């Protein structure tokens, strides 16, 4: 799956236009160093890596929350997942409206805080609290709140690196979009693995499953503040 596309990319155009208007090639190691030296990208990745850690932490722990804390069936867990994913098309429209009015930066930071709010509701689903509201209902509300953020999280890893790469290309004259996406992918894969390891350790604690929601909320708030100095993602100026 990786080698095939690479071979196609390396082929010369069939119309004989090879070499015409070709951009100067940047050596691999130099491209990596330039990518990691891009301050805007580092601000972006510090926040995205943190939120991705939290997101993977939650996704990995959701089954434990359902089984060990809420004591609900797989069918009921499916209802919670539906509450999270079914509204995403509408949430993407809302995310785009916020982006147009206040900019992608504000929209992303709002998504982080909204997801944190949803995560803070999950401890209330612990059936040992004997809250008069069903844990399933609270879980559906929590995941429903998080659906806005999930829709945004589908967009961010594609839109932001593309914008950063476009600005970088204007400044350097070299299009290295692929490297920005590659570095992001490697970092996020590492954070996903780290999230799984930390989750395993947390679940050894008696109340570890109850702490999953607040822990994820904390990572989202941290990502919110890490994104504060991101210089791009401002609203588009209205044309008179």
Model regions: which residues?
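Membrane-embedded alpha-helical bundles of multi-pass transporters/translocases
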Residues: 1-240
């Amino acid at each position: 799956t990786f080698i095939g596309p690479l071979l196609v990319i390396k082929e010369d155009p069939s119309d004989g236009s090879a070499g015409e208007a070709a951009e100067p090639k940047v050596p691999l190691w130099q491209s990596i160093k330039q990518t990691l030296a891009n301050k805007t990208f580092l601000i972006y990745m510090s926040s995205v890596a943190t939120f991705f850690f939290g997101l993977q932490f939650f996704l990995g722990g959701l089954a434990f929350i359902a089984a060990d804390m809420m004591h609900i069936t797989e069918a009921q867990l499916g209802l919670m997942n539906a509450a999270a994913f079914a509204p995403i098309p509408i949430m993407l429209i809302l995310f785009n409206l916020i982006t147009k009015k206040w900019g992608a930066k504000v929209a992303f930071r709002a998504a982080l805080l909204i997801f944190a709010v949803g995560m803070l509701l999950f401890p209330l689903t612990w059936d040992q609290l004997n809250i008069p509201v069903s844990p399933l209902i609270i879980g559906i509300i929590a995941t429903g709140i998080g659906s806005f953020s999930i829709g945004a999280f589908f967009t961010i890893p594609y839109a932001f690196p593309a914008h950063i790469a476009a600005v970088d290309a204007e400044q350097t004259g070299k299009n290295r979009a692929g490297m920005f996406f590659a570095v992001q992918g490697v970092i996020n894969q590492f954070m996903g693995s780290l999230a799984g390891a930390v989750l395993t350790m947390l679940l050894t604690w008696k109340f570890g499953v109850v702490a999953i929601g607040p822990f994820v909320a904390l990572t989202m708030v941290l990502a919110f503040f890490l994104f504060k100095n991101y210089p791009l993602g401002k609203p588009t100026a209205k044309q008179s």
